[in-house]
Amino acid sequence: MRRVYTNRRAHHEYELLERFEAGIALTGSEVKSVRAGGVDFRDAFARLNNGNVELEGLYIPTYTEATYNNHEPRRTRRLLLHREEIGKLKRALEQKGLTLVPTRLYQKGRVFKVELALARGKKLHDKRRAEAEKTLRRELREL
């Protein structure tokens, strides 16, 4: 079974510019916990640290069947990207107002991947305009 977790708030809070696929380094108990469910993207973001991309704030609940080897739910997790992609992200993040937001966590084959989006935060009036356009499209579709 292929479980996909999405960050629904990212589409509302940010204007998503460009997407990247990254591997994620997980421990054994984290993998089992992700398969069991309950991943939470609230407050999750990615950042560059010493040439590595790290994912902060992603909540993966502790695995109930694990013993003393259980993981910390909100630990910093390393993301695996090609060197060229990291360079591209570094240049893009130097621009004012851009951030790196996780949008999806999914399984591809036997490994887990995170979809990252280069994003710019929306202002309140932008959110209202997007909501009005969405409502208008919904009404037109109903006619």
UniProtKB/Swiss-Prot annotation:
One MF annotation (Gene Ontology) recorded for this entry:
RNA binding
Establish whether keyword Hydrolase is in the entry: no
Q: Which InterPro entries match?
A: SmpB, SsrA-bd_prot, SsrA-bd_prot_CS
Q: Which UniProt keywords apply?
A: Cytoplasm, RNA-binding
Q: One GO CC term of this entry?
A: cytosol
For this protein, the parts annotated as crossing the membrane are none
Q: Which residues form the signal peptide?
A: none
Is the keyword Cytoplasm in the record? yes
Subcellular location, in the record's words? Cytoplasm
CDD domains with a match to the protein in the record = SmpB
Biological process annotations from GO: trans-translation
Similarity section: Belongs to the SmpB family.
Q: Which PANTHER family match?
A: SSRA-BINDING PROTEIN (PTHR30308:SF2), TMRNA-BINDING COMPONENT OF TRANS-TRANSLATION TAGGING COMPLEX (PTHR30308)
Protein name in the entry: SsrA-binding protein
The gene for this chain is smpB
